[in-house]
């Protein structure tokens, strides 16, 4: 995963996605729903290190609240598996020891999906980039940091620990490839959790749903038949949207280096090219619209590290996926 997992980075990215969606979506909502329409239920929380939101329409408020509560409990359970902030999480234990026996099936499944997207993007998406993030964080945390970034030798040493092919995954155990290797799931876990919540609600009979767990996925639209409307944040003004899209039966994710810059110029940021070991700068942002949030999340991350021609080649393999690649030239 090219995006690091720690909470400050996740929170910044989630907030601009949430604000963009709220700003764009609020205009589509009637000020006072017609009496014949099901009421809208909105639940906001602080999960996965950032603000989250579930919106749904249903005539039974008690049933809606109970369903949302079950979903939030599931999010917390998955967070205890995927989190790097929780020292007892399955991922933290894997990174500490390099091996994990009897891993949770959700971790096995998610790493399997991640490996698929790594292969599909020729390694541009890689869950093992955490050593690069640690290197850049340490470098730019120093008061006299070289503005050009870490020394080439230090990047090479970090890169020697990066490589999705080194990770061994089975239902019985997961093993990292070498000492100092570490995994971050921040380029795919939010999408996975968004899908889990959406599918739980759908299984319980809720279909007019918009879920935001860092990535967004919608089922049917509003009670009045209008679609949900989601705004894509402007790279220079992340609190505002430069484009608003309808969202029904689809998911969307956006990646942008402006979300967590390491330096004032923004040239060094949290979206790494795991092949070069440096921040990718082909685009200001990449937004992906896909049937599910896991795909949207992973591809928005992986495509960010690919030049346009290579990115389009990847997209050709996904006929149900669309992308907006906002280049540095605008």
Positions of PLM-derived features:
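Mature catalytic core of soluble alpha/beta enzymes
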Residues: 1-330
């Amino acid at each position: 995963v090219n995006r690091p997992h720690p909470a400050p980075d996740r929170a910044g990215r989630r907030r601009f996605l949430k604000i963009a969606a709220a700003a764009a979506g609020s205009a589509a909502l009637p000020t006072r729903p017609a009496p014949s329409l099901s009421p809208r239920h909105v639940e906001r929380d602080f999960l996965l290190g950032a603000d989250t939101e579930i919106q749904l329409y249903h005539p039974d408020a008690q049933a809606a609240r109970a369903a949302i509560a079950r979903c939030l409990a599931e999010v917390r359970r998955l967070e205890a598996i995927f989190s790097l902030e929780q020292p007892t999480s399955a991922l933290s234990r894997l990174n500490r020891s390099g091996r994990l026996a009897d891993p949770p099936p959700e971790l096995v499944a998610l790493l399997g999906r991640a490996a698929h997207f790594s292969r599909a993007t020729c390694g541009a998406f890689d869950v093992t980039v955490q050593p690069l993030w640690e290197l850049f964080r340490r470098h730019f945390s120093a008061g006299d940091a070289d503005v050009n970034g870490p020394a080439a030798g230090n990047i090479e040493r970090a890169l020697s620990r990066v490589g999705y092919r080194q990770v061994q995954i089975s239902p019985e155990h997961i093993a990292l490839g070498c000492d100092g290797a570490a995994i971050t799931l921040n380029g795919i876990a939010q999408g996975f959790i968004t899908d889990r919540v959406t599918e739980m609600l759908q299984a319980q009979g809720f279909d007019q749903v918009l879920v935001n767990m860092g990535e967004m996925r919608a089922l049917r639209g509003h009670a009045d038949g209008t679609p949900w409307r989601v705004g894509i944040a402007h790279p220079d003004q992340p609190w505002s949207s430069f484009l608003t899209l309808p969202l029904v039966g689809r998911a969307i994710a956006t990646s942008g280096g402006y979300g967590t810059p390491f330096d004032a110029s923004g040239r060094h940021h949290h979206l790494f090219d795991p092949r070069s070991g440096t921040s990718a700068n082909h685009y200001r942002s990449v937004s992906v619209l896909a049937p599910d949030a896991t795909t949207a999340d992973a591809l928005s991350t992986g495509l960010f590290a690919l030049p346009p021609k290579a990115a389009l080649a990847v997209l050709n393999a996904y006929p149900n996926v669309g992308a907006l690649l906002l280049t540095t030239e605008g």
